[in-house]
């Protein structure tokens, strides 16, 4: 496989060193100095502050939309069937969430109000792929796509199921805290069967391979190596929730990252590591330096964060095997039962773990979050999961407004253009070499998809909290998916479903 030497100048383009940003810049500049297409357009966003991280454009423009695409970006006024005055507001590429587990209508609604136009399930993935895509066709508010999941393949093989309507790590059976698929070592024949499932998923258009060895401690190093070999052979991205977290070594986050980097080096696979802050905790800067070193030596590695100091997962998962307090540096009171918001005791921990359900884990240092957010190659992904009776982690509801409101406007940790790059362009660039449809996203230029977010930079903020997560973000004025409004005047638009599937096929 072709190799290259990555550098900071590459940012997050992965192997695509000559980014589509260059092409977008050329197209936009040529268009601005040429003849505008004739109107009227279906929709015109008039007089907004257009910010395009790909070209660096930051100025007042008028955007014309036709046939789901951006048809004009003009300094002169345009005529539209529907014209919306967006003066005083920022018009940016729609936000792309590479780590969205809440693949439901409710999840879409929360994310739309947070400015998201594309929500991808890339960590856990799903299976079978055709079933997963067909179940969402014509019903999605946002663009959608998924990897084929290693965990899902493990469930299928270890439970000897011939066919499942949909297998997903986000739909675990909670009746057994130690099912075979989590803790049992697979035989060579079973690993072969898993690889077969994954390969069929890739043929069906999955966006890559998703892995979560933290949830499958029975998966051997050989098993994971086989998955990395498959990703390299099929030339797709691998997404991974690393095997272990925390600062206690061996068996902590450095150990886990070394396993990932060794597999990348040995196979030539491209990898994206999810939520680096909840893996590294106080060691996050050290992990980022390891990733920098790997990239400088030609390995194709990227990562992400979510802007919260708490993680979330299933209480019955392998992450809470004995010794978790020492590994994570926390105690029972730092674990919050999502359904009620209560902090746990030893007694309630034992009771709820036997029942199964989501918890919020308060364990990420603010300094680790800021180190990742300011790092030039780290993008944003929510890791949002479905709420349970209105309870849960707020990251699936307020991630993007939180970045813009708290970390840009209020605390000035990063500037606005940098933030927009991390929440729109960078995820598109990371995927575009492997998924051609992503070349048309994350950018404002003629010919790009009309996935656009319009927000008030003076008002945008998250309102979702750990105690009350089911609260929409504020200041996201309009959101368009393929040129169709899904949010207008900060209200969800009823009876629209413009979301389109994103698969590896163009």
What are these regions (language model features)?
Residues 76-81, 85-139, 252:
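Metal-associated gating/positioning segment near the N- to mid-region
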Residues 139-144, 227-236, 240, 266:
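Alpha-helix-loop-beta-strand connector modules within alpha/beta enzyme cores
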Residues 94-103, 213, 238-244:
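Histidine-centered catalytic micro-motifs
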Residues 13, 21-61, 66, 75, ...:
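Active-site microenvironment of metallo-dependent hydrolases
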Residues 148, 154-221, 261-265, 269-416:
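Active-site neighborhoods of metal-dependent hydrolases
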Residues 127-130, 218-224:
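Active-site-adjacent beta->alpha loops and helix N-cap segments on the catalytic face
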Residues 1-13:
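N-terminal secretory signal peptides that target proteins for export/translocation
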């Amino acid at each position: 496989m072709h190799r290259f030497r990555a550098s900071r100048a590459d940012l997050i383009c992965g192997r695509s060193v000559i980014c589509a940003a260059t092409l977008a810049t050329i197209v936009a500049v040529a268009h601005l100095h040429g003849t505008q297409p004739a109107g009227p357009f279906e929709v015109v966003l008039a007089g907004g502050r257009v910010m395009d991280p790909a070209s660096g454009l930051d100025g007042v423009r008028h955007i014309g939309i036709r046939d789901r695409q951006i048809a004009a970006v003009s300094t002169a006024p345009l005529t539209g069937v529907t014209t919306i005055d967006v003066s005083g507001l920022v018009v940016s590429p729609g936000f792309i969430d590479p780590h969205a587990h809440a693949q439901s209508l409710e999840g879409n609604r929360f994310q739309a109000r947070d400015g998201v136009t594309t929500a991808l399930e890339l960590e856990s993935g799903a299976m079978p792929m055709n079933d997963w895509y067909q179940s969402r066709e014509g019903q999605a508010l946002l663009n959608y796509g998924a990897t084929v999941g290693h965990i899902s393949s493990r469930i299928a093989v270890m439970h000897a199921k011939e066919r499942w309507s949909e297998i997903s790590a986000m739909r675990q059976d909670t009746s057994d805290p130690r099912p075979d698929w989590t803790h049992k070592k697979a035989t060579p024949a079973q690993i072969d069967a898993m690889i077969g499932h994954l390969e069929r998923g890739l043929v069906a258009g999955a966006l890559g391979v998703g892995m979560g060895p933290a949830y499958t401690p029975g998966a051997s190093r050989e098993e994971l190596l086989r998955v990395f070999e498959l990703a390299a052979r099929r030339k797709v991205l691998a997404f991974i929730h690393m095997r272990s977290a925390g600062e206690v070594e061996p068996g902590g986050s450095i150990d886990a990252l070394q396993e990932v980097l060794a597999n990348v080096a040995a196979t030539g696979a491209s990898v994206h590591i999810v939520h680096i802050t909840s893996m590294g905790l106080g060691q996050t800067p050290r992990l980022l330096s390891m990733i920098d070193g790997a990239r400088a030596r030609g390995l194709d590695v990227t990562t992400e964060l979510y802007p919260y100091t708490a993680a979330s997962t299933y209480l019955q998962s392998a992450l809470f095997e004995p010794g978790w307090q020492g590994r994570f540096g926390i105690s029972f009171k730092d674990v919050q039962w999502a359904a009620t918001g209560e902090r746990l005791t030893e007694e309630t921990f034992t009771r709820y773990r036997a029942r199964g359900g989501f918890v919020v884990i308060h364990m990420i240092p603010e300094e680790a979050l800021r180190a990742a957010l300011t790092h030039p190659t780290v993008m944003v992904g929510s890791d949002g999961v479905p709420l349970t009776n209105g309870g849960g982690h707020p990251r699936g509801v307020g991630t993007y407004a939180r970045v813009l409101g708290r970390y840009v406007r209020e605390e000035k940790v990063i500037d606005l253009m940098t933030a927009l790059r991390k929440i729109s362009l960078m995820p598109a660039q990371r995927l575009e070499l492997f998924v051609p449809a992503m070349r048309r996203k994350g950018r404002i230029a003629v010919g790009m998809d009309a996935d656009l977010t319009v927000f008030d930079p003076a008002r945008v903020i998250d309102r979702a909290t750990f105690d009350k997560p089911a609260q929409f973000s504020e200041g996201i004025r309009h959101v368009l998916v393929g040129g169709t409004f899904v949010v207008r005047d900060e209200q969800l638009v009823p009876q629209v479903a413009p979301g389109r599937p994103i698969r590896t096929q163009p």
